Amino acid sequence: MKKYLLGIGLILALIACKQNVSSLDEKNSASVDLPGEMKVLVSKEKDKDGKYSLKATVDKIELKGTSDKDNGSGVLEGTKDDKSKAKLTIADDLSKTTFELFKEDGKTLVSRKVSSKDKTSTDEMFNEKGELSAKTMTRENGTKLEYTEMKSDGTGKAKEVLKNFTLEGKVANDKVTLEVKEGTVTLSKEIAKSGEVTVALNDTNTTQATKKTGAWDSKTSTLTISVNSKKTTQLVFTKQDTITVQKYDSAGTNLEGTAVEIKTLDELKNALK
C-alpha cells in the first residue's frame, strides 16, 4: 500500500513539474519587467530538471521556456494560430530583449525587434525570402533612423525623423546619406554604421564672389558656412539630434546673438541661403 501511495505521489509530482510553465501565476511565480515594456513570469521553484520555468505574452502570443537563472533571463518560444513561430530571447543581465517572428518552418524571419534598457530599439521587417526589407532604429530621445525599400545589396531609402522635421536620403551598406537642397546649395549629412556623423556642403554656383563653402569640425559637430572666404553662418548638430543656427557679423569674425534651434525644414533651407 505504501509503495502504491509513493508511486501515485511520484506521478503527481512529475505531472506538476510538467505543468509548471502553463500553471504559472502570481502565487508560484515572480513578475519581472523587461525592456520593450514586456514582462516575464519566473517560477519560484525549479522543475524536475533543475530549471526555472518562464512564461510571457507578447503580441497576444503565449511564450514558454526554461532557464538556469531565476532572474527572468532565457529563451521562450511559442506558436501563433497561423502556425508561424515566435521566439523571445532575454539577455542574462536583462539589458536587452529580442523578439522574433518566423514562418512556419521556424527558420525564415518575418520580423525582429530588439529593445534595450536604455530605451533604444531596432525594428526589422523581412521579405518572403527572409531578407531585410525595412528597418527602424529608435534612439533614446525618441528620434528615429528609418530604412525602407531595402534591396539584397544593402541599398535603399533612408529617413531621419528628428523632433520637429525629417531629413531624407539613401542608405548603402549601413551608411546613410541625407540631403537638403536650397538653390545651388546641397547640405549632406552622412551617418556611419558606428553612428559617427559627418556634414558637408556643396555649391554648384560658378560665381566665386557668391559661392558658398562649408568646413566641418567633427570635434564640435559644427559646420561653418562661408561666402568668398568670409564666415557667414554656423550650424551645430547637437548630441540631442537637434540643429542650431547662429550668424556671424558682417566682417565674418565673430558670432552674433545666440544659437537658435531649427524647428522646420524651411528654417534649415533658409540657413543655406
UniProtKB/Swiss-Prot annotation:
Lipid tethering residues (S-diacylglycerol cysteine): C17
Topology class, membrane: Lipid-anchor
Transmembrane segments: none
Gene from which the chain derives: ospA
GO cellular component: cell outer membrane; cell surface
Predominant cellular place of this UniProt entry's protein: membrane
Taxon lineage: Bacteria, Pseudomonadati, Spirochaetota, Spirochaetia, Spirochaetales
Signal peptide region: 1-16
Cross-referenced Pfam families: Lipoprotein_1
The protein's name in its UniProt record: Outer surface protein A
